[in-house]
């Protein structure tokens, strides 16, 4: 875009030309515009930072931020499930800061490293209590190791005490194993003795039955079938026949006769019926009327 803008501008000739014996100097009217363009071009320049082997060759450690004395770079080994977002949440920093410290262009550059540097605040929880993180050492610092050689007598006494402790420990383990084996053998022998002396109980008798007949004998089944198929239908027919006729056989039919005599009534097609006469008692009015008639 910058190149196109420069080409789109019209060419302006020099206003003043100064000649010298060795060169020609051209003076333009809009000199300030050229200086502005030059400053813009300088601002668009990109600063390249060394990465990987170039950073190791240079051997110069650049701090995370200029004048940021409260920031410390901590180095830790990467795991398979680590990511930039996880590291940023874990150490309380930004993803951009981690990428800037480790010279990452893309997030996939994380998987090319075995260890990563994380910017954290100095005198914080991570720098004081976290044992997994190690502070990044500057190349100029030197590590000094002090080794104290113990005395021969102390070393001999210490080794003898350790050896005696180990022997006691292994002896205790052997005794525990022997006790466990002996107890297991004793339990096995006692179980065998108890089972040999104990008489076997007879098996309970099983009642022969099938699932279909529920243990009913064959003659019981025959009796039930005769009862249901023959006897019950006969009683059913007799009962309804008697209810339909409305009369019982050999029943007596009695009738009242005024003279108090007894008569037998016969009806064709039916049995003879006996009629019993009931004597009638005359009332008092009828007797009074009879006496008055006799007096007249």
Curated annotation (Swiss-Prot):
Main location (coarse class) = membrane
Task: Show which residues sit on the Extracellular side of the membrane.
Answer: 1-217
Q: List residues traversing the bilayer.
A: 218-238
PROSITE patterns from the UniProt entry: LYSM (PS51782)
Its Gene Ontology cellular component terms are:
membrane
The gene from which this protein is expressed is: LYSMD4
Membrane-side (Cytoplasmic) residue stretches: 239-296
Localisation per UniProt entry: Membrane
**Topological category with respect to the lipid bilayer:** Single-pass membrane protein
Q: Which UniProt keywords apply?
A: Glycoprotein, Membrane, Transmembrane, Transmembrane helix
Q: Which residues form the LysM domain?
A: 74-118
* Sites carrying sugar chains: 30
**What is this protein identified as?**
LysM and putative peptidoglycan-binding domain-containing protein 4
Judging by the UniProt lineage, the source's domain of life is: Eukaryota
For this protein, the record's Gene3D superfamilies field holds: LysM domain
């Amino acid at each position: 875009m910058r190149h196109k803008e420069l080409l789109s501008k019209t060419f302006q000739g020099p206003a003043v030309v100064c000649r010298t014996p060795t060169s020609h100097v051209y003076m333009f009217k809009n000199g300030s515009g050229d200086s502005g363009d030059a400053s813009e071009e300088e601002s668009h320049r990109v600063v390249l930072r060394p990465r990987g082997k170039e950073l190791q060759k240079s051997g110069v450690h650049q701090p995370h931020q200029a004048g940021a004395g409260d920031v410390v770079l901590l180095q830790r080994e990467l795991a398979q499930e680590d990511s930039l977002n996880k590291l940023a949440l874990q150490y309380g920093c930004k993803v951009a800061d981690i990428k800037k410290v480790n010279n990452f262009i893309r997030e996939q550059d994380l998987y090319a490293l075995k260890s990563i540097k994380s910017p954290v605040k100095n005198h914080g929880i991570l720098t004081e209590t976290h044992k997994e993180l190690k502070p990044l050492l500057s190349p100029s610092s030197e590590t000094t190791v002090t080794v104290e050689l113990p005395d021969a007598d102390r070393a001999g006494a210490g080794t003898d005490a350790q050896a005696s402790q180990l022997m006691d420990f292994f002896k205790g383990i052997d005794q525990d194993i022997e006790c466990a084996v002996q107890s297991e053998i004793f339990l096995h022998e006692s179980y065998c003795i108890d089972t040999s002396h104990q008489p076997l109980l007879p098996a309970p008798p099983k009642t022969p039955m099938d699932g279909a007949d529920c243990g009913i004998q064959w003659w019981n089944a025959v009796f039930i079938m005769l009862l249901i198929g023959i006897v019950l239908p006969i009683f059913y027919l007799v009962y309804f026949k008697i209810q339909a006729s409305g009369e019982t056989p050999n029943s007596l039919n009695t009738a009242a006769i005024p003279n108090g005599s007894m008569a037998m009534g016969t009806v064709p097609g039916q049995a003879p019926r006996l009629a019993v006469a009931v004597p009638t008692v005359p009332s008092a009015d009828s007797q009074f009327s009879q006496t008055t008639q006799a007096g007249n």
